[in-house]
Amino acid sequence: MNSSVQGYRRVVVKLGTSVLTSGSKSLDKAHMVELARQMAGLMKSGVEVVLVTSGAIAAGREHLGYPVLPDTMANKQLLAAVGQSQLILAWSQLFSIYGLHVGQLLLTRADLHDRERYLNARDTLNALLAQGIVPIINENDAVATTEIKVGDNDNLSARAALLCDADLLMLLTDQKGLFDADPRKEPNARLIPEVEHIDDSLRLLAGGSVSGLGTGGMATKLQAADIARRAGVEVIIASGHHPEVIKKAVHREAVGTRFLAIESPLESRKQWILAGPKAKGRLLLDIGAVAAVTCRGRSLLSKGITGVEGQFERGDTLELVSPDGRVVARGMARYQSQALNLIAGKHSDEIEPLLGYDYGDAVVHRNDMVVLEMIGEAK
């Protein structure tokens, strides 16, 4: 694609259940066609669009006549299985009005965890976009269990943005954006128009949606924004009912809260470490190790580990945790958990005598690590 609008050549649009139902129990087809019109307009102007859509369970309930069912995983998966076909049919019909075809990708965390499957999903996305087809992504709720679920479509959309190397991620919701206080409780709450850095004070501002139909609140949107912007993707959180919201966002008009992308984004493999695999365990670090890996770009050595949590194998993804409980980095383990329990707190020259082998001094190498928060001083 050679064309772009305001520098955007590829955009991911995430639509939450509250947007698609307009707060009701049914899909709001009139609003969906308006959103399809805006996305089709982008496609016609040369901007590629990937749609991440919620609403399968709501569509399933509607199609089955709103049955009264126990709130179990099996029944949620039943509704998702019925509703997903209705949801993709609705989108297919709506985009066909504008001469566009759609292609469906149903993903689970397992598709993102495995590097080969991750790359295959990326190839499929790129192939669809190359043919002018709108990829429509949803989590495969009909088969996903707690262990393999991404968990919410906010985080799924961030991972989709990384998969397809998007320039912009729009998280469209039932809120106007991120406020400096809860607008439902504070009438004088003000919209935050632009965010350069995501820190603990900003996370405290993130509240939840009141619709009750979706799984994502403002906190999950902030998580998604943090993932995407680290990969060089700009993010906008805005109301899906704001007039011409998609067009305005792409033309950089004042709408919602815009999160600026980090200027030096992660390379592809580190993007996958950040957003793909589920962390299988945690390494607790002393403050010296935290400063070394976050501020000085060092690999993690066994000496700086004060505790090991979880069971994991060599190559699994881990969270690195500061003494005050903050996750400061993610990285790939060079030793399994059983071995790390033996060498935690030990000097590197003690690894081989203790284990009978060694894979090098680094427990997590800096090339296999993504720093999330800088703590300490660079020296």
From Swiss-Prot:
Pathway, per Swiss-Prot/TrEMBL?
A: Amino-acid biosynthesis; L-proline biosynthesis; L-glutamate 5-semialdehyde from L-glutamate: step 1/2
Question: What is the purpose of this protein?
Answer: Catalyzes the transfer of a phosphate group to glutamate to form L-glutamate 5-phosphate.
Which cysteine pairs are joined by S-S bonds?
none
The protein's Enzyme Commission number: 2.7.2.11
What's the superkingdom here? Bacteria
Its recorded name reads Glutamate 5-kinase
- What compartments host this protein? Cytoplasm
Binding, ATP: K14, T173, D174, T215, G216, G217, M218, A219, T220, K221
**Keyword match Glycoprotein:** no
Please, one GO biological process term? L-proline biosynthetic process
InterPro entries to which the protein is assigned, alphabetical: AceGlu_kinase-like_sf, Asp/Glu/Uridylate_kinase, G5K_ProB, Glu/AcGlu_kinase, Glu_5kinase, Glu_5kinase/COase_Synthase, Glutamate_5-kinase_CS, PUA
Q: Which family is annotated?
A: Belongs to the glutamate 5-kinase family.
**Record-level Gene Ontology MF annotations:** ATP binding; glutamate 5-kinase activity; RNA binding
Q: Where does substrate bind?
A: S54, D141, N153
What is one cellular component GO term in this UniProt entry? cytosol
So which residues are the signal peptide here? none
Has UniProt tagged this entry with the keyword Cytoplasm? yes
